[in-house]
């Protein structure tokens, strides 16, 4: 396992033990970076109009289209480290 993969895995664990819950904007950013880092560009249909949370997640992930999985993983690691202080 590469250093980046190990760091990404550790950040996934660390995010669950943050001292404070991040704001919704940061949570969406974490979600989008995680999905981009694991799966690449957004796929599948956009959630229905009344699925506000699903739509917000889909749009946040879609904004990262074209970013490599390695870039997204590194940004996820960096964001979690920043949140941990």
Q: Model segments located where?
A:
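A charge-rich, low-complexity, intrinsically flexible signal that marks solvent-exposed coils, linkers
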Residues: 1-85
